[in-house]
Amino acid sequence: MPFCLLDVDKDIPEREQHIYIKDSKEPKGHCKQRCNTNTIPGSMTERGCAFAGVKGVITGAIKDVLHVVHSPVGCTAYGNGTTKRYPTRPEMPDGSVFPVENFNLKHIVGTDLTESDVVFGGMNKLKKVIREASKEFPFVNAIYVYATCTTGLIGDDLDAVCKEMQAELGKDVVAFNAPGFAGPTQSKGHHVGNYTIFENLVGTKEPPKTTDYDINLIGEYNIDGDYWVLEKYFEDMGINVLSKFTGDATHGELCWMHKAKLSLVRCQRSATYVAKLIEEKYGVPYLKVDFFGPEYCAENLRAVGKYFGKEIEAEAVIQKEMEKIQPELDFYQSKLQGKKIWISAGGPKSWHLSKPIEQYLGMDVVALSGLFEHEDGYEKMQERAKDGTIIIDDPNTLEMEEVVEKYQPEIVLGGIKEKYFFHKLGVPSVMIHSYENGPYIGFGGFVNMARDIFTAIYNPAWKLMGFGEGEPGDSNE
């Protein structure tokens, strides 16, 4: 069997089923990698919680809602760590302008629960905070309220409070019941967010106008401007993005997703749920799409073009974009050919990016890992990896150090929590969750990512510190 127990895991042998070495001789689907389970005690995980999954991923990118976190101050602060991850524009679907640009990045409200609130209950405090927040920000179109571990344990009824406040305030007040302990990873929060939005919002409003070429772009969160790249491609093809779920989206867009002609699911781990629900109830079909890397981007633009009879327009976009990026792609391939890379993403990016990085940059993908991926995602990683690649579910800190020692990656695509850990080991790291200098999606986005990888590897600082092969001046070529 191709499962592997790393040396550091001798005292937690259960980890063996979470670590897989690709072997093409094994029958396809024969080895089911263990995943989406509670982290084993003693394993220093890098995972986020269910609350992070709903607020930090699903709803954090919406431009015109106010977020109220029912928690002690720590969870509220944690819930506001979106930084540049989800930029928004003030323009609204009806032509009006939202009064605060990047409102979602600037404001969050918490109930600041204390010991007394835990003992006697915090529902009255929550009502008071919602009323005060509504007066402070009267222009928001909805208020989203979040449970956390503390309020989940004491049993505060967020649904009842939100129902009462919605009637009082005359705007949608929606409860998201995903306290941190609700699931093994942030993936549970994705699930709760999808179902809450579908059950409470989808089908409750009508769009200002519709066309025969309307799509929902689902699971696209506009990380560092990703959505705006795809929006331009679709615009050039004559296709209208009616609703986003949820990058640069408005509350209203979530309410009229049922009016689209087709849904495209970009992040297949966090948002396939709502696409399935919309198809089942409203008959809107969906396609799973991948826009990372030139080949996948072209392939999926063609699929969308074929669905709407826009094949010629799709080919024109592909040709124009490839002509733009080819010279830079050739340069970065010449500099990155053969260099070892570890892709350590939360979920789908680990399998989205492995083949394009090998195909267009000539890099050697030696390791793949995920923090909250499910079985179908690991099957895709296994399918796209070459023999000998190590694939890890929920890697802990000691495992990461051992993988660096044994597989010698020259760069890691990972998250902010791991970035400086790898730096201490002398390995450059580029953030793949919120990006360094994005966007990373689409044709030009792939070049942006290649540039950041190149700059990180050839940064002269590594040579000055006695690590790597950075050469002064190389990063400025």
UniProtKB/Swiss-Prot annotation:
Primary role: This molybdenum-iron protein is part of the nitrogenase complex that catalyzes the key enzymatic reactions in nitrogen fixation.
UniProt xrefs under SUPFAM superfamilies: Helical backbone' metal receptor
Organism whose genome encodes this protein: Methanococcus maripaludis
InterPro entries: Nase/OxRdtase_comp1, Nase_asu, Nase_comp1_asu, Nase_comp1_CS
Amino acids binding [7Fe-Mo-9S-C-homocitryl] cluster: 267, 433
Comment on bound cofactor: Binds 1 [8Fe-7S] cluster per heterodimer.
Pfam families reported in the protein's UniProt record: Oxidored_nitro (PF00148)
Protein's recorded name: Nitrogenase molybdenum-iron protein alpha chain
